[in-house]
Amino acid sequence: MGMRYRALHSWDVRPDEAVEIQKMLAGSVRFQRVDRVETVAGADVSFSGSRAHAAAVLLDYHDMRLLDVSFAEMDVVYPYIPGLLTFREGPVILRALEGIDEADVLLFDGQGIAHPRRFGEASHLGLLLDRPSIGCAKSRLWGEFREPDGERGSFSLLVDRGEVVGAALRTRTNVRPVFVSPGHMSDLSSAIEIALNCARGYRVPEPLRLAHILSLKRARMTR
C-alpha cells in the first residue's frame, strides 16, 4: 500500500494564486510531538532540462537500512520561484511517494514553517499526505539565527520577528549547519531529534542524502 495524498488544490495556478493557496492552507498545519518512529521516508528531485526526476526512499529509523525505493518523472513547466518550490517539485515528489509504503515521518529537502507564509514544502506536502513531516534544508530561506557551536548536535534557533520557526542544526562537528523546521504534525524538538538521528556521518540526513543520489543518477541517465 503506497502513500496516498489529498488533492486539496490545483497545481496549475499562477504565482499569485499559489501564494493565496499557501496562505489559505497554512492555518491547517498542526504541531505535535512525533513519537514511536520506526520508519522514515525522504524524497528529492533532480532535473534534466525541463524533466524532473524524483526519488523516494523508505528507511528503518534505527539503523538507516533501505526498505523501499520508488521513482517518478514528469515534465515541469512551473518556474523556480523562492517560496513556491512545492508548485514546481510537489507533483513529481507525490507521485514517487505513492510507490513506497507509508512512513512514520517524512523528511523533505526544503522548509517547513521557516517560510514567509509558514507553509514551505515540508508543511505543504505533509498536509496533503496527512503524515508527520520535517523540513531539512541546506540553506536558509527565512528567519535570523546565530551560528551554533561547532559540536555535532549543537543548534541555534531560527527566528522571524520574535517567532521561533526552526533551528540551525550542526549535524557534523565543524561542518555548516542544516536548517530544520517542523512541517506538519511535528514540532521543533522532534524535528531536531529526528534530523540528527538520521545524520549518520554526513551533513545531510541519510534519507535525503540517499534520495538525492538516486534522483541525480536517474536524471543523468537521460542526458
UniProtKB/Swiss-Prot annotation:
Transmembrane segments: none annotated. It holds the Pfam family Endonuclease_5. GO terms for molecular function: deoxyribonuclease V activity; magnesium ion binding; RNA endonuclease activity, producing 5'-phosphomonoesters; single-stranded RNA binding. Keywords: Cytoplasm, DNA damage, DNA repair, Endonuclease, Hydrolase, Magnesium, Metal-binding, Nuclease. It is found in: Cytoplasm. Mg(2+) binds at D44, D109. The record marks Y80 as: Interaction with target DNA. GO terms for biological process: DNA repair. One of its GO terms (cellular component) is cytoplasm. The keyword Secreted does not apply. Its EC number is 3.1.21.7. It catalyses: Endonucleolytic cleavage at apurinic or apyrimidinic sites to products with a 5'-phosphate. InterPro entries: Endonuclease-V. Its cofactor is Mg(2+). Belongs to the endonuclease V family. DNA repair enzyme involved in the repair of deaminated bases. Selectively cleaves double-stranded DNA at the second phosphodiester bond 3' to a deoxyinosine leaving behind the intact lesion on the nicked DNA. This is Endonuclease V. It comes from Methanothrix thermoacetophila (strain DSM 6194 / JCM 14653 / NBRC 101360 / PT). The gene is nfi.
